[in-house]
């Protein structure tokens, strides 16, 4: 009788271990999926931000971590959950930009001495937050526009009846037909003290997505 009791206790501990392992799998899947969503969104934000600066479109909301639909990010979360043998639902949130994921394991706990475990799946939740790491820096000094040359004025005609039209005055230097100014250079100041200068006319040495935004798991 004592041996049977010990066996039952051992099987119960085994069932608890199975459940814990399945629960850990669910949490791993949820964490990975949430981070995958945040990282996908961060990459999209970075691309959209630099494109907006290059074309002169509004960009400050993008620098704040907003302005890109979360559809692709959530699709990335669901794909990563599948890599961890789980199904996931993803919900995008704002202020701060975040992605909440609930993952359910595809495998069950398995058969054990505890009734019903063969049909029990584990669930877990995770949330990733995307936060800006940079703020707008000082605006560059505007380049002064040279004034066009001034003319000498029209000449006067002679004093006869009809009067000659006279020589026309020199119109001075013709106005300079400068091409329209392109989008302005943008300075960014980031958390690590790094200063970035994004020049639309010279798109080199640009910040990476990880320089502009951080992604972390949150409670």
PLM regions with names:
Residues 35, 86, 131:
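Residue-level marker of positions within ordered structural domains that often coincide
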């Amino acid at each position: 009788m004592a041996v049977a009791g010990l066996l039952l206790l051992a099987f119960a501990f085994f069932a608890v271990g199975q459940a814990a392992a399945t629960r850990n799998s669910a949490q791993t899947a949820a964490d990975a999926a949430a981070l995958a969503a945040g990282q996908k969104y961060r990459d999209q934000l970075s691309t959209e931000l630099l494109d907006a600066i290059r074309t002169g479109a509004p960009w400050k909301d993008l620098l704040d971590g907003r302005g890109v639909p979360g559809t692709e990010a959530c699709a990335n979360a669901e794909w990563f959950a599948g890599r961890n043998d789980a199904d996931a639902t993803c919900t995008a949130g704002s202020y701060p930009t975040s992605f909440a994921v609930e993952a359910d394991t595809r495998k069950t706990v398995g058969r054990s001495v505890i009734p019903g475990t063969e049909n029990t799946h584990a669930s877990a939740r995770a949330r990733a937050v995307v936060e800006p790491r940079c703020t707008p820096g000082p605006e560059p000094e505007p380049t002064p526009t040279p004034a066009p040359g001034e003319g000498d004025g029209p000449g006067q005609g002679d004093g006869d009846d009809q009067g000659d039209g006279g020589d026309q005055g020199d119109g001075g230097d013709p106005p300079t037909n400068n091409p329209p100014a392109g989008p302005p250079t943008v300075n960014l100041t980031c958390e690590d003290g790094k200063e970035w200068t994004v020049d639309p006319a010279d798109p080199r040495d640009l910040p990476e997505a990880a320089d502009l935004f951080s992604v972390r798991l949150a409670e």
